[in-house]
Amino acid sequence: PDGHPVPHAQVLRQLLEQAELADEVGLHAFGVGEHHRRDFAVSAPEVFLAAAAARTKKIRLGSAVTVLSSDDPIRVFQRFATVDAISNGRAEVMLGRGSFVESFPLFGLDLADYEVLFEEKLELFDKVRAQKPIKWEGRTRRPINGLSVYPPLEHHLLPAWIGVGGTPESVLRCAEYGYPIIFAIIGGTPGSFAPLAGLYREAMAKYGHPMQQMATHSPGHIAATDEEAREEFFPHWLGQRNQLGAERGPHTVDQRQRCLIGFGQRRQNHFVPTE
């Protein structure tokens, strides 16, 4: 608030207080992202969510998102199954590739494998989530032949979403697995995502899956009035957008601009949408 960064440890403690307050006022869900850079505090969402589970009663607790591409799908499931047990069935996971890529060199992964890592790890996670002995093989890890994963969830499958940054390929991937989808509206207008929502509905039907929930994510700020919220929020939003623009190039933003900041995605898929 005073223009100086807040220490990461303090941010984490404040987030726990926010989770408690969200539970007290009756919000449905509380999610935290996974980042591995100086301007974000949460690098281990499941550890935070376990702490939040012990301090809340009803609110659902999830990631937003877990960067599956640079993690182990089996460990992701195990950690969220643990949070689910601690919270008595309130855990859910949101899977994504992440628009930030710091985790790839940090964990010894090659960005050239960006596509195949998510493809294969999502396939493996889906098998683990079914809570049956796993038989799987791919290019990114050794085969698994008939092993089981523990702990299992008590009463249900682990609720899982896929976060999508705004490309048809990602929408089709989500529909192929029949998962609920959340659109990350980082920039631009919500209306620009309407065609993707239509594509998701169509693809879910083509793949033979029952329709699942759709949701959106968008940055925001709450104040006493809309004008006050804009005045308080815009300088910080602008600073972050321009910082990302400097890192990723060439975009910067001002009050007349709204830029979609993301990574191009390409994917081969046998689904062909109807014209």
Regions found by a protein language model. Name each.
Residues 39, 101-103, 170, 223-226:
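Short catalytic/ligand-binding loop motif for oxyanion handling, primarily in non-cytosolic enzymes
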Residues 6-8, 41-43, 73-74, 106-108, ...:
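Short, solvent-exposed loop/turn segments at secondary-structure boundaries
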